[in-house]
Amino acid sequence: MSRIAFLLVLVATTAGAAAEQVVVDFERGAMFSANDKANRFPEWVEKGVVFRLAHEPRLSKAKGLLMFFTHLSTGRRGIVCAMALEPIPVRATFPKPARSVTVAMWGSTGVPAVLEAFDEDGKLVDHASLPSAPGRKAPGDPVPIFTMTVNAPRIAYIEFSGPREGEYLVADELRFTPN
């Protein structure tokens, strides 16, 4: 009888561990490089999730880069496309497929927000969007942080996008549940 109880406990804890949510918060990211210039980089890896632009710039020969951006009210860091004149979706590729992904974001006033989930074949499997990110209610208010979630059986990567030229959309935190 004790072997059966042991096996049940083992199965329950293994199943629970597999379903634990993983949180990526970008707090390890450096805001500035050694020479005090804005820290721009082609790729960021945290907790096995690889962040990079979905494609290279098409309107210029510039190298596509990401950067960290600080939410002034909270001091938290987020990741954003560093290409102000050519907004490019930011892609986050998971080390193993996920079944649910939630991204906390904030952005320019009125910026549209799109979150798309893709499987390992590049097929769109879920989509969430807002025509306009929530804005401040008064000039002294902090920029609101909002969340978007996508769900599908085997999400290989997500992309977040929406900004037009000169706008920004920052991922403040990414939470995913592996399969």
Which positions does each model-derived feature cover?
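Sec-dependent N-terminal signal peptides
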Residues: 4-13
